[in-house]
Protein backbone atom coordinates (compact mmCIF):
# COMPACT_ATOMS: atom_id res chain seq x y z
CA UNK A 1 0.00 0.00 0.00
CA UNK A 2 2.80 2.43 0.87
CA UNK A 3 4.50 1.79 -2.46
CA UNK A 4 1.20 2.24 -4.27
CA UNK A 5 0.66 5.56 -2.51
CA UNK A 6 4.15 6.73 -3.49
CA UNK A 7 3.54 5.77 -7.11
CA UNK A 8 0.18 7.52 -7.04
CA UNK A 9 1.79 10.66 -5.62
CA UNK A 10 4.50 10.60 -8.30
CA UNK A 11 1.87 10.11 -10.97
CA UNK A 12 -0.16 13.04 -9.63
CA UNK A 13 2.91 15.29 -9.67
CA UNK A 14 3.76 14.27 -13.25
CA UNK A 15 0.16 14.78 -14.34
CA UNK A 16 0.09 18.21 -12.71
CA UNK A 17 3.37 19.19 -14.35
CA UNK A 18 2.12 17.98 -17.71
CA UNK A 19 -1.11 19.93 -17.33
CA UNK A 20 0.82 23.07 -16.37
CA UNK A 21 3.07 22.66 -19.40
CA UNK A 22 0.09 22.15 -21.70
CA UNK A 23 -1.61 25.24 -20.26
CA UNK A 24 1.52 27.36 -20.70
CA UNK A 25 1.83 26.15 -24.28
CA UNK A 26 -1.75 27.16 -24.98
CA UNK A 27 -2.97 23.59 -25.57
CA UNK A 28 -5.73 23.84 -22.96
CA UNK A 29 -8.62 26.26 -23.18
CA UNK A 30 -9.65 28.55 -26.03
CA UNK A 31 -9.22 31.90 -24.32
CA UNK A 32 -5.48 31.81 -23.65
CA UNK A 33 -3.56 34.08 -26.01
CA UNK A 34 -0.86 32.31 -28.00
CA UNK A 35 1.39 33.35 -30.89
CA UNK A 36 -0.66 31.10 -33.17
CA UNK A 37 -3.89 32.91 -32.26
CA UNK A 38 -2.30 36.22 -33.20
CA UNK A 39 -1.05 34.77 -36.50
CA UNK A 40 -4.47 33.29 -37.23
CA UNK A 41 -6.05 36.69 -36.62
CA UNK A 42 -3.63 38.37 -39.03
CA UNK A 43 -4.44 35.81 -41.71
CA UNK A 44 -8.19 36.01 -41.11
CA UNK A 45 -8.05 39.74 -41.85
CA UNK A 46 -5.40 39.99 -44.57
CA UNK A 47 -5.38 36.51 -46.12
CA UNK A 48 -2.90 33.65 -46.18
CA UNK A 49 0.37 34.41 -48.00
CA UNK A 50 2.84 31.52 -47.73
CA UNK A 51 6.48 32.57 -47.72
CA UNK A 52 5.83 36.08 -46.39
CA UNK A 53 6.16 37.50 -42.91
CA UNK A 54 2.91 37.54 -40.95
CA UNK A 55 3.27 41.23 -40.10
CA UNK A 56 5.18 43.95 -41.90
CA UNK A 57 4.89 41.57 -44.84
CA UNK A 58 5.70 44.10 -47.57
CA UNK A 59 9.23 45.42 -47.54
CA UNK A 60 12.63 45.61 -49.15
CA UNK A 61 16.11 44.68 -47.92
CA UNK A 62 19.07 47.03 -47.65
CA UNK A 63 22.74 46.82 -46.75
CA UNK A 64 25.25 49.40 -45.64
CA UNK A 65 27.37 50.29 -42.65
CA UNK A 66 27.18 52.00 -39.27
CA UNK A 67 29.91 54.51 -38.54
CA UNK A 68 29.87 55.49 -34.83
CA UNK A 69 30.74 59.02 -33.78
CA UNK A 70 32.51 57.81 -30.63
CA UNK A 71 30.16 59.68 -28.31
CA UNK A 72 28.42 56.50 -27.14
CA UNK A 73 31.70 54.84 -26.14
CA UNK A 74 31.41 56.45 -22.70
CA UNK A 75 28.08 54.67 -22.17
CA UNK A 76 28.99 51.23 -23.49
CA UNK A 77 31.99 48.98 -24.05
CA UNK A 78 30.23 47.29 -26.98
CA UNK A 79 32.43 47.00 -30.04
CA UNK A 80 29.69 48.53 -32.20
CA UNK A 81 30.52 51.93 -30.69
CA UNK A 82 34.29 51.74 -31.14
CA UNK A 83 34.71 49.86 -34.42
CA UNK A 84 35.39 52.40 -37.20
CA UNK A 85 32.78 50.91 -39.54
CA UNK A 86 30.24 48.16 -38.76
CA UNK A 87 28.53 46.20 -41.58
CA UNK A 88 24.74 46.44 -41.51
CA UNK A 89 21.94 44.54 -43.18
CA UNK A 90 18.35 45.64 -42.77
CA UNK A 91 14.81 45.72 -44.06
CA UNK A 92 12.37 48.56 -44.64
CA UNK A 93 8.69 47.62 -44.45
CA UNK A 94 5.18 48.88 -43.93
CA UNK A 95 2.87 47.53 -41.26
CA UNK A 96 0.27 44.89 -41.95
CA UNK A 97 0.07 41.29 -43.10
CA UNK A 98 -0.73 41.88 -46.79
CA UNK A 99 2.46 41.80 -48.93
CA UNK A 100 0.58 43.46 -51.80
CA UNK A 101 -0.90 46.35 -49.81
CA UNK A 102 -0.40 49.86 -51.21
CA UNK A 103 2.56 51.68 -49.67
CA UNK A 104 0.31 54.61 -48.80
CA UNK A 105 -2.40 52.56 -47.08
CA UNK A 106 -0.69 52.17 -43.69
CA UNK A 107 1.02 54.98 -41.74
CA UNK A 108 3.43 52.70 -39.85
CA UNK A 109 6.83 52.20 -41.48
CA UNK A 110 9.54 50.06 -39.98
CA UNK A 111 13.27 49.47 -40.21
CA UNK A 112 14.93 46.37 -38.79
CA UNK A 113 18.74 46.26 -38.77
CA UNK A 114 21.50 43.87 -37.78
CA UNK A 115 25.00 45.14 -36.95
CA UNK A 116 27.82 42.56 -37.08
CA UNK A 117 31.09 43.57 -35.41
CA UNK A 118 34.59 42.25 -36.08
CA UNK A 119 34.68 40.48 -32.68
CA UNK A 120 31.54 38.45 -33.27
CA UNK A 121 29.11 40.69 -31.38
CA UNK A 122 25.79 41.06 -33.20
CA UNK A 123 23.20 43.75 -32.49
CA UNK A 124 19.62 43.60 -33.73
CA UNK A 125 16.98 46.26 -33.35
CA UNK A 126 13.49 46.84 -34.70
CA UNK A 127 12.30 50.40 -35.21
CA UNK A 128 9.07 52.08 -36.29
CA UNK A 129 8.38 55.61 -37.41
CA UNK A 130 5.94 56.32 -34.53
CA UNK A 131 7.86 57.49 -31.45
CA UNK A 132 5.50 55.46 -29.24
CA UNK A 133 3.55 52.21 -29.42
CA UNK A 134 -0.19 52.18 -28.89
CA UNK A 135 -0.01 49.44 -26.23
CA UNK A 136 2.64 47.59 -24.28
CA UNK A 137 1.46 43.97 -23.89
CA UNK A 138 0.71 41.12 -26.34
CA UNK A 139 -2.86 40.88 -25.02
CA UNK A 140 -3.51 44.58 -25.60
CA UNK A 141 -1.95 44.34 -29.07
CA UNK A 142 -4.24 41.42 -29.89
CA UNK A 143 -7.25 43.46 -28.76
CA UNK A 144 -6.04 46.33 -30.95
CA UNK A 145 -5.86 44.05 -33.99
CA UNK A 146 -9.39 42.79 -33.34
CA UNK A 147 -10.72 46.32 -32.86
CA UNK A 148 -9.24 47.41 -36.20
CA UNK A 149 -10.64 44.47 -38.16
CA UNK A 150 -12.92 45.51 -41.02
CA UNK A 151 -16.63 44.84 -40.65
CA UNK A 152 -17.55 41.99 -43.05
CA UNK A 153 -20.75 43.82 -44.01
CA UNK A 154 -19.12 47.13 -44.94
CA UNK A 155 -15.46 46.30 -45.49
CA UNK A 156 -14.59 49.23 -43.21
CA UNK A 157 -13.50 49.52 -39.60
CA UNK A 158 -16.22 49.72 -36.98
CA UNK A 159 -15.96 53.11 -35.20
CA UNK A 160 -17.75 51.68 -32.17
CA UNK A 161 -15.18 48.93 -31.69
CA UNK A 162 -12.34 51.40 -32.08
CA UNK A 163 -13.87 53.76 -29.52
CA UNK A 164 -14.37 50.90 -27.08
CA UNK A 165 -10.74 49.87 -27.48
CA UNK A 166 -9.54 53.45 -26.93
CA UNK A 167 -11.65 53.74 -23.78
CA UNK A 168 -10.26 50.45 -22.45
CA UNK A 169 -6.69 51.47 -23.28
CA UNK A 170 -6.20 55.17 -22.52
CA UNK A 171 -2.43 54.63 -22.85
CA UNK A 172 -2.98 54.45 -26.61
CA UNK A 173 -3.81 58.16 -26.66
CA UNK A 174 -0.22 59.20 -27.42
CA UNK A 175 -0.15 56.96 -30.49
CA UNK A 176 -3.52 58.26 -31.70
CA UNK A 177 -2.29 61.82 -31.29
CA UNK A 178 0.79 61.00 -33.37
CA UNK A 179 -1.30 59.31 -36.08
CA UNK A 180 -3.69 62.27 -36.30
CA UNK A 181 -0.85 64.67 -37.12
CA UNK A 182 1.36 62.31 -39.11
CA UNK A 183 2.57 63.56 -42.49
CA UNK A 184 4.27 60.78 -44.48
CA UNK A 185 7.42 61.47 -46.43
CA UNK A 186 7.89 60.30 -50.00
CA UNK A 187 10.59 57.77 -49.12
CA UNK A 188 11.73 55.26 -46.52
CA UNK A 189 15.07 57.09 -46.64
CA UNK A 190 13.59 60.39 -45.42
CA UNK A 191 11.67 58.83 -42.52
CA UNK A 192 12.76 58.99 -38.88
CA UNK A 193 12.71 55.70 -36.96
CA UNK A 194 12.45 54.95 -33.24
CA UNK A 195 13.33 51.70 -31.47
CA UNK A 196 10.38 49.86 -29.97
CA UNK A 197 12.39 49.10 -26.82
CA UNK A 198 15.39 50.46 -24.95
CA UNK A 199 18.77 48.75 -24.68
CA UNK A 200 20.84 48.50 -21.50
CA UNK A 201 24.26 49.90 -22.35
CA UNK A 202 26.97 48.84 -19.87
CA UNK A 203 29.92 51.21 -19.46
CA UNK A 204 33.48 50.42 -18.36
CA UNK A 205 32.56 50.75 -14.67
CA UNK A 206 29.65 48.32 -14.99
CA UNK A 207 26.93 50.96 -14.75
CA UNK A 208 23.82 50.41 -16.89
CA UNK A 209 22.25 53.08 -19.09
CA UNK A 210 18.85 52.41 -20.73
CA UNK A 211 19.06 53.95 -24.19
CA UNK A 212 16.57 53.79 -27.09
CA UNK A 213 17.75 53.92 -30.69
CA UNK A 214 16.66 56.76 -32.94
CA UNK A 215 17.68 57.06 -36.58
CA UNK A 216 17.42 60.51 -38.11
CA UNK A 217 17.54 60.63 -41.92
CA UNK A 218 20.14 62.61 -43.81
CA UNK A 219 17.79 62.78 -46.79
CA UNK A 220 15.69 65.93 -46.66
CA UNK A 221 11.99 65.50 -45.92
CA UNK A 222 9.61 65.77 -48.84
CA UNK A 223 5.90 65.20 -48.35
CA UNK A 224 4.19 62.30 -50.04
CA UNK A 225 2.07 63.59 -52.94
CA UNK A 226 -1.69 63.48 -52.56
CA UNK A 227 -1.95 61.20 -55.60
CA UNK A 228 0.51 58.33 -55.78
CA UNK A 229 0.74 55.60 -58.41
CA UNK A 230 1.49 52.63 -56.19
CA UNK A 231 3.07 49.69 -57.97
Language model segments and positions:
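Active-site-adjacent core segments of small-molecule enzymes
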Residues: 1-231
Amino acid sequence: PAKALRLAAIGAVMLGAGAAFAYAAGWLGETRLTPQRIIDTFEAQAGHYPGYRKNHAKGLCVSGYFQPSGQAASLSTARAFSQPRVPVIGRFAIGGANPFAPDTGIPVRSLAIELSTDVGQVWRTGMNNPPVLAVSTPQAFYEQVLAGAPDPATGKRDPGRLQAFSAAHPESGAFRQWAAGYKPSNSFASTQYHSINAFRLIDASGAAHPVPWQLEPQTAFAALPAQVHDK
